[in-house]
Amino acid sequence: NPLTPIQLSAERLAWKLHDKLDEQHAQILSRSTDTIVKQVAALKEMVEAFRNYARAPSLNFEKHDLNRLVEEVLLLYEGGACRFVPNLSDKPQPISADTTAMRQVLHNIFKNAAEAAEEAEVPQVNVSVGEDNDGQVLLTVCNNGKGFSKEMLHNAFEPYVTDKPTGTGLGLPVVKKIIEEHGGRISLSNQNEGGACVKIALPRLVETYA
């Protein structure tokens, strides 16, 4: 990746010249190289996001209980500034899914929900697993943030559309692509009492016996 040498060169430049400059110019150098490093990091993130969006993945489908997948990923968010409140199903919710791809979906949705709730007095994300009226396995993730803008509600799954100042705008399009490859669907909405919701419906895995 040609971006990595740029990032390393900026860091090396700052390290080599810092002690050779007076304080004023050292600060200018530090700010400039810091800007380069941060912008290169943002570009690398965007390149990786575009790669995930553009490539045709090779999925390995296995039987999973969505309850368990959600539990596993939520463990990574324990102790954070945002409180996650799980409301999982009291019975297994079987799906056929690629483990890595589905964890990527869950991470993206949970991370976005937590970031969107940061401005709330007590940031909270409610995560529920159950079934919808069609009998599909349903994941619902709602936060107590300010909700989606009108533009996001209409164009969230279009590449490069984002509410976040540092977002790539490729997270939700990648999520939608993965969900559709699993035969599911995803939708966004705002709650009447405030906050945003993401709903993902996936085909229920029905095992047949010969």
Residue ranges and their predicted role:
Residues 1, 56-59, 90, 94-97, ...:
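Conserved micro-motifs of the catalytic ATP-binding
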Residues 2-41, 61:
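Histidine phosphotransfer helical core of two-component systems
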Residues 73, 83-94:
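Conserved catalytic submotifs in the C-terminal HATPase_c
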Residues 143:
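Acidic ATP/Mg2+-coordinating residue in the GHKL
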Residues 148-160:
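Short conserved segment of the HATPase_c
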Residues 171, 175:
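Short alpha-helical Gxxx[C/S/T] motif in the catalytic ATP-binding
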Residues 179-180:
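Detector for a conserved hydrophobic position within an alpha-helical segment of the HATPase_c
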